[in-house]
């Protein structure tokens, strides 16, 4: 399997889909980033961690668009942290990609689930989510409330 060609083709397909179906942009993005994250996770197991940097350079050159190491790393984290987690999987497509990029910095899965749920419940913007994370809202919850999540 040629991981690079698979990733490149998926990203090109995603760019086409974005132009045709703007209304489903977020779903298309998350599906694509899930797939690319999965491919990067598998490629990393075969070729090592440096593959993300290599693919970033190649994708930026081939597609004339900036696919930074950080962006590709976030795609892999989205797949590994969110989509592969049984508790988080059912809610994986609820938020925008920018929301997930903020949540990927959190290591505690219960905390991520808490923030996903409040974003959904209160329709929080990315900026509002960042404020709640900076204010450590989850950490200030009583222990009993955390256990119910």
Regions found by a protein language model. Give the residues of each.
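Basic, low-complexity intrinsically disordered segments
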Residues: 1-149
């Amino acid at each position: 399997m040629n991981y690079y060609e698979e990733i490149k083709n998926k990203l090109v397909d995603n760019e086409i889909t974005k132009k045709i179906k703007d209304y489903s942009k977020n779903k298309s993005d998350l599906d694509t980033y899930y797939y690319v994250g999965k491919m990067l996770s598998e490629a990393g197991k075969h070729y090592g961690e440096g593959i993300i940097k290599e693919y970033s350079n190649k994708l930026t050159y081939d597609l004339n668009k900036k696919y930074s190491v950080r962006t590709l790393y976030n795609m892999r984290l989205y797949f590994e942290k969110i989509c592969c987690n049984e508790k988080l999987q059912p809610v994986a497509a609820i938020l925008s990609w920018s929301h997930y990029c903020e949540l990927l910095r959190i290591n505690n899965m219960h905390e991520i689930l808490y923030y996903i749920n409040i974003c959904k419940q209160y329709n929080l913007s990315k900026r509002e989510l960042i404020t709640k994370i900076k204010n450590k809202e989850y950490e200030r919850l009583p222990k009993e409330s955390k256990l119910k999540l």
